Amino acid sequence: MIAMNNKLAQPYAMAFLEFSLDAKQTLDTTIADLTQIKTILHDSVDLSKTLSNPLLSIKAKKEVIKAIFEPNISKNTLKFLLVLCDRGRSANLSSIIDNTIELAYKKASIEIAYVTTATAFSSNQQEALVEKLKSMTSTEQIKLNITVDKTLIGGFKVQIGSKVIDTSIQGQLRQLASHLGSSAI
């Protein structure tokens, strides 16, 4: 399902970035708008359910989008959201927004580090991780995408590009179990 969403989201993401740059909207504005939309969608389960509801008319969905987002985002970003509604893609809004943010970061030469942690990071821990990742990857700008997952027990995992760093207790236990299992044979 994720691959299909990604396949569907990619053309919309590329088209919106091209449209926003042609309309002289800065990448900073685009990223700020999309990040705000992503946060609101993540925080409001009811909004996500409303936009995914096939029984709700396109007109009603557009009214909801206008009421929530119009005062806070640029006109071009609002137009993009309304076009997605017209095309029947409001249910895929989260994946389209995620893809668009990812493309905007690439265009702005910002590397995204996906961090999964057992407990929330403080701002000092985030800054220290960014600095360490910068030195490891020779990247000038890194944006952290942090997810809290209690099943890690402790520690964290980082994926940046194709590199994965797993310092979690869950990962260490998995590695130990694998090692013990292979040496017993």
UniProtKB/Swiss-Prot annotation:
A cellular-component GO term for this protein: chloroplast thylakoid membrane
Keyword Nucleotide-binding: no
Alphabetical list of PANTHER family matching this protein: ATP SYNTHASE DELTA CHAIN
Molecular function (Gene Ontology), one example: proton-transporting ATP synthase activity, rotational mechanism
Cellular localisation: Plastid, Chloroplast thylakoid membrane
Family: Belongs to the ATPase delta chain family.
Keyword Cell membrane assigned: no
Domain of life: Eukaryota
Chief localization: plastid
Functional summary from the UniProt entry: F(1)F(0) ATP synthase produces ATP from ADP in the presence of a proton or sodium gradient. F-type ATPases consist of two structural domains, F(1) containing the extramembraneous catalytic core and F(0) containing the membrane proton channel, linked together by a central stalk and a peripheral stalk. During catalysis, ATP synthesis in the catalytic domain of F(1) is coupled via a rotary mechanism of the central stalk subunits to proton translocation.
Description of how the protein assembles with itself and partners: F-type ATPases have 2 components, F(1) - the catalytic core - and F(0) - the membrane proton channel. F(1) has five subunits: alpha(3), beta(3), gamma(1), delta(1), epsilon(1). CF(0) has four main subunits: a(1), b(1), b'(1) and c(10-14). The alpha and beta chains form an alternating ring which encloses part of the gamma chain. F(1) is attached to F(0) by a central stalk formed by the gamma and epsilon chains, while a peripheral stalk is formed by the delta, b and b' chains.
Signal peptide residue numbers: none
Gene3D superfamilies, per the entry: N-terminal domain of the delta subunit of the F1F0-ATP synthase
Keyword set, alphabetical order: ATP synthesis, CF(1), Chloroplast, Hydrogen ion transport, Ion transport, Membrane, Plastid, Thylakoid, Transport
UniProt protein name: ATP synthase subunit delta, chloroplastic
Organism the protein comes from: Guillardia theta
Record membrane topology: Peripheral membrane protein
Pfam families, per the entry: OSCP (PF00213)
